[in-house]
Amino acid sequence: MSNLLLYLLAYLIGGIPFGYVIAKYFAGVNIKEHGSGNIGATNVLRVLKKIDPKRAKVLAGLTLFLDAFKGAFVILVAKFIGVCDATLWTLAVIVIIGHCFSPFLKFEGGKGVATTAGALLVLIPYAVLVGLVVWFIMAKTVKISSLSSLTGILVGIFSAYILYLHPSIESHAPLWIIAFIIVYKHRENIYRLVTGQEKRVV
């Protein structure tokens, strides 16, 4: 299988908008028209708690799992067929781009945190676990999803420099490309954080 075909498949798989589909199918809601308009688990939880509070956490959890799973799935399949490390990292970047700029939603999409965690869990698991611990602590204490996610991502990247001194592709550049995408997708959240307007998840 050529790399170009792999890249296309990674982009299409990454673009599957699970949050949008789940909210539409199970609650009859266009998630893009409610709350923050984001298709991620946080907005699914926030919006569905008002409509179907009994199932909101389950559906948000399912969204989180599937968004992470598609990132891991792409990398696991690529490893199984034996592609090189450089291609694996390229696929990781592309599956995240697919999620953030979905071809199925007119190139709009989520913010990439769960898909990043899934893809990188296969490539640099220890760094991801460090980031997840930080994210979890922040989420439980500060209860601001965007701040928790951004902090977890940055801590995970910096920990990769310690835990993976000799990265398989001789560079940590893909991590910073991914970080840039996620920060870009959170630009409105960052503005609200700076101005004290960002909402908590309760």
Residue locations for each model-derived region?
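Interfacial segments of multi-pass membrane proteins
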Residues: 45-52, 78-81, 98, 112-142, ...
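Nucleotide and nucleotide-moiety/phosphate-recognizing core
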Residues: 51, 59-65, 70-103, 134-136, ...
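Cytosolic, membrane-interface loops and tails of multi-pass inner-membrane proteins
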Residues: 22-57, 191-202
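N-terminal signal-anchor transmembrane alpha helix
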Residues: 1-27
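Short, non-helical or kinked segments that cap or interrupt transmembrane helices
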Residues: 29-40, 104-117, 144-152
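Loop-to-transmembrane alpha-helix initiation sites
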Residues: 129, 145-153, 166-178
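Core segments of transmembrane alpha-helices
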Residues: 63-76, 113, 129-132, 151-156, ...
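Helix-coil boundary and interhelical linker segments in multi-pass alpha-helical membrane proteins
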Residues: 1-9, 73-90, 121-128, 161-174
